[in-house]
From Swiss-Prot:
Gene3D superfamilies found in the cross-reference section: 2.30.30.30, Nucleic acid-binding proteins
Pfam families registered for this protein in UniProt: EFP, EFP_N, Elong-fact-P_C
Record localization: Cytoplasm
Protein name in UniProt: Elongation factor P
Protein's organism: Elusimicrobium minutum (strain Pei191)
Keywords linked to the UniProt accession: Cytoplasm, Elongation factor, Protein biosynthesis
Pathway: Protein biosynthesis; polypeptide chain elongation
GO molecular function: translation elongation factor activity
Lineage summary: Bacteria, Pseudomonadati, Elusimicrobiota, Elusimicrobia, Elusimicrobiales
GO CC terms of this entry: cytoplasm
Amino acid sequence: MISTTDFKEGLIFENENGEIVEIVDYQHHRKSQARAVVRVKLRKLGSGSYVETSYRPEDKFKEVSVEKRPFMYLYSEGDMAHFMNNESYDQVAVPLDKLENQRKYLIENMECTGLYINDQLFDIVLPIKVVLTIKSTVPGVKGDTVSNLTKEAELETGVTIKVPLFINEGDKVIMDTRYCTYVERA
C-alpha cells in the first residue's frame, strides 16, 4: 500500500474507483485552519484521458507492478494500430479507441513504451516531446518574430495547435504530448 507521501511523478497505482492511473503532477496544499490535501493530476492508463482530484494525507492506495518494454509504432489499418516490440520483434495490434489521446501524435517508426501489467499489454506511452511537421497554417509576416502572438496550425497528424507567428508551412516543431502544446522549432 502507498500513501500520498509516496506520490511522485510517474508513479502508477490503483485509485479508489479501481482504475489504474499514473501521476502527471501533484502538489501538497495546507491552509491555516483546514486539513492538508494533495492535489493530483492523473492520467488514466488504458484510455489516456486526464483527471484532476484531491486526496487526504491518510488515504492509501494499491501499488501496481508495471513492466515497461520498448515499442515502435508501425502503421494503422482499419480500427487497429500496429506496434512492434523492439526486444522480441513481436507485432501487437491495439484498438485505436484504446489510444484515445495518443493517436493524435502517432507517426510511423515512432519510439514509444508499452506498459505491461500481469504480462498483458495495458497501455502505450508516447515520448513527452515529439517532432512533427506543420501541414498548413497562414503565412507569417516579416517582423512577427518579436511578438508572442500565436496562430493556429495543422500538424501532419491532423491535430490543430497554437504556434508562434514565425512558424510556416513545412516547418518541423517539437510538441509536448502531455498538454498538446508547441515547445519550440525543431
